[in-house]
Amino acid sequence: MNQRQNSSHHKRAVREARLAKLLFAFIAIASLAIIIFILNIPSIINNENNLLTKNVSTTQQNSSTTSEDKEVHTARITASGDMLYHDIVYGSAFDGQTYDFKNDYEQITPLVSSADLALGDFEGTINPDRPLAGYPIFNAPEEVVQSIKDAGYDVLDLAHNHILDTGISGLKYTANAFRKAGLDIFGVKVDPNEGILVKEVNGIKVAILGFSYGFNGIEASISQEDYNNHLYDLNMDKVKAQIEKAEEIADFTIIMPQMGEEYRLSPTDGQIETYHKMIEWGADVIFGGHPHVAEPTETIEKDGQKKFIIYSMGNLLSNQRIETLDRIWTERGVIMDITIQKDGSQTTLTSVQAHPTWVSRTPINRTFQGYPAYDYQVFLAEDYLPGAKYANTVDETTRQRIEKAYHEMLELLNGSSTNSVGGSNLTPN
């Protein structure tokens, strides 16, 4: 009996010893786990903070992207008419050693340079390998480029009937002369692979196209290959394709076509039909040229948006005037001033203003090829209204001539003249 009891006590003692060891091992493992957890708390917190920061950053980025998508962008764009350097214009600028054109655009520089994008129309060529000429062939001194740049112009239209006056070499030299000065050109191609000119202006992509009705017959002297590689005409299938392409790659499309009847104060049926088709195909604004006088404007509603046409902006600079052609409208022009707005994916025309111009021609103390020379300047007509800043700088007869040009120009553009196309209720300035 005692032996049996001793054996039983021994077995119980062994079991208790094993349980004690197991309990001790469990406690040790649990303690170790707690210690490891405590030591890793900062890392866990840091990871959670990193995750939180990442989530907040992503949220902020998404918010920023949404904000950018909703941001409204605006841009002011100006456009003006023909720059025609007749021989007396460039000849008067020659002082015996150099050509100085700095006065030409001095008074319009504040307006032109204040625009986010300024478009001009250089009607002629620059080719130092050919003689200078000012009618019927136009070939100006290269010094004109700097004066145009100094006036604030950004882009020049070269699609016009005089671009072949000094051949394909003249076309290329003209384009490259402006590009060398930091200006863009459109309406011709130096490289056949050049695409549509698109200027990004304050976050708005603006496509600019130019087309000419013809090239004074000089195109017959070049190959078909050169014609196709370098010129943009008014082949309507090609025009349509260009406009549709512009609509794909830009937010807003501007066209500066050259067509119409010279010295006519209203558009031809062909102009109206052609420009309406351009609007139908996607153009937003059309700044017309070629007639050497201004023609009326028109606003068209399309898809709930306003589209704008000016059939001709007239001359900006030339020797054409009442004294030389007995045509008073040739000394008058207009600088168009529009504002466009991009809101999300939609870009619209929001305002249109007109700034009538007048070419001043005053005698200077020298001659050109035996003829009197002149100082040519483009005036902003609004600056010569009664009480305006330059009203007292000219004689009263001249001031009244400029004031008359101002009022009659706005009447013409707004459609108050005979044979108008409706007008646009333009704001004068």
Go through each PLM region and give its residues.
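Acidic, metal/ion-coordinating pockets
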Residues: 2-11, 19-429
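Polyanion-binding surface elements
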Residues: 15
